[in-house]
Amino acid sequence: MNVKKKFEKNIFTEVIEDKPPKNQTEKEENINNEINNNKEQNENKIDIIKGKSSEDIKNSQKNQKIVKKIKEISSQDFISIEELRNICWKGIPSEDPLIRAECWKILLGLYPLKKELKNSVIQRKKDEYLDMCNVYSNALKNPEEVMNEEELKIYRQIQKDNPRTMPESSLFQNNKIQYMLTRVLYIWSLRHPASGYVQGFNDLCIPFFIVYFLEKFPEKNIDTILKLDENEFKKLSEDTLTEIETTIYFSLTKLLDRIQTNYTINQPGITKMIKKMELIVEKVDPKLYEYLKKFEIDYVQFCFRWMNCFLIREFPVKLILRLWDAYFSEEKGFSEFHLYVCACLLLTFSEKLKAMTEFQELIVFLQNLPTANWTIEDMDMLLAKSYSIKVLYSNSIILKSDGKNQ
């Protein structure tokens, strides 16, 4: 991503619409402007009547422009991935659920950049996943009889973890969803023996389920899709459910392919990430670093979960989707940029932490950060600060972590 370009423009700058054609007469232009202004004013009045604040209206108009720009980019015969990354980094508006689903599939590499290949790729992926389902069908129906000891161990752990996946959500507690989640995780684990199943994989599937189910229920929002009831669920055909499950499987695969050493034996990738995060904190806020060191705070005690589940358990779902918009838009979003986000999250509470005087007080706070009431604006600010830190310190952090002279 072009750093200079990103800093020259505020990362939250609105997308400017195209100018009208040059051959348009001044009279026609004035008439069109008047019509558009009246239309916009009327829409604003309606929004105010509905109880929306002027800030809400402004954000809505900005989001509409972003959606329009994303649609323009994604409708090209050959999609400019750099353009798409730049716009999605700022946050994909939730008003149109189809947009986020489409963008994630492109950014993950599930969809080809060449538009004419899209349908054939989708069908090939679907056929491939159905073949895998057929291979493991008998085992999943009769686990005790068909699976060997190692497979049964994986299956039982998945069965144990899945009911804990958003237990307050009727969507995730639906029996069909539980089976879909089990099948996705079991097939992935058996096809990736280097890591197998690791606790937390069920959490990594949460954003994908929400985004791809919203795609099929565009009239809903993040909160209402989590409350999807049995009658609404039954509206989806088996073919549609297979399509969703296929997309979730390959999305998880694309994500884990980027960070697989996080989940191999002894999880060396996570150990390395935690060490790098510690170096970032030392560089950016040496006073906080020394303060935590004085109390012998081990970063593993509080941020292992941050690395293992990519902050899914630390923030409300809508903020995780916003966070992952940025991660998918970064070339090394999960393996590198995530470290700066985690460090910046810790630095956000620097003064509070330095005011604490007991080890137990510190560790309890670090394991339960007060982020439940954070807003999208708070997440935007966290991402902006994280990016600034990355630009300013990334070279020296990498050199130090590699054991070289700075």
Residue spans for each PLM region:
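Glycine-rich ThDP/TPP pyrophosphate-binding loop and its adjacent helix/strand module
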Residues: 321, 325
